[in-house]
Amino acid sequence: VKKGNRAIGRNEAIRNTTGDIIACSDAGCTLDRNWIQEIVEPFDEKNVNVVAGYYKGLANSIFQKCLIPYVLVMPDKLNAKNFLPASRSMAFRKSIWKKVGGFPEEFSHNEDYVFAQKLKSIKAKIVFAKDAIVYWMPRKNLKEAFIMFFRFALGDTEASIFRLKAVLILTRYSVGIISLVLFVLFRYYFMFYVLGSIFLLYCFWSVFKNFVYVKNWQAFLMLPLLQLVSDIAIITGTTLGLLKKYG
């Protein structure tokens, strides 16, 4: 067995296939009974190179229910035209896999996103199959969630991918830290009240944007907590990625 990261494993498996169409999912995901039929059906059209399937969270606790909208694209926010395939639920022709050089083996945390960006850059014909569903099991606690977000951010930075959300988070906290330093140095008490108000609004916003997916009173505590944990994980992951890349 060839040793290595997920990308190495995926590429080795694909090299040893004999078929033209490769269907792919992740460990820990449960496939819908019709998944394979739905994910390969669009290939009846010869010009289709890639099929992006969909995914849903399989929550067993309120924590997992709150975590899902921080990780997955929720149905009401779905844009089928711009939906990129993820390794949880995707299929592609072996020829297009060869054309982009396979999954990037130098990346261990987000190889499927880099792979999808390569497909997009060569204008591969990508079709979204909303009924090709896999069920994803969310992380079970804050520690596991932190590590997941941290690895996402680290992987993106290593691949020179800077998502708008990550940039906004870094900007948000940089302004907050500068404002806090100004308060400590110059005793700008007005700044203290402003920061406190902004923090409370930020917590309220985290509930407002995601409560509809949870609909449980415990979400009023859990959603702000997850917002802060994911923010800190993204900041630390991005910072470490930058240090490794340019330090």
Give the ranges of each region predicted by the language model:
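Glycine-rich, basic loop-to-helix element that forms the pyrophosphate-binding segment
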Residues: 1-17, 38, 87
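Short, acidic/glycine-rich phosphate-metal binding loop used to engage nucleotide
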Residues: 1-6, 56, 81, 105-106, ...
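Active-site acidic Asp-centered loop
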Residues: 25-27, 104
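Conserved donor NDP-sugar-binding/catalytic core segment of glycosyltransferases
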Residues: 30-64
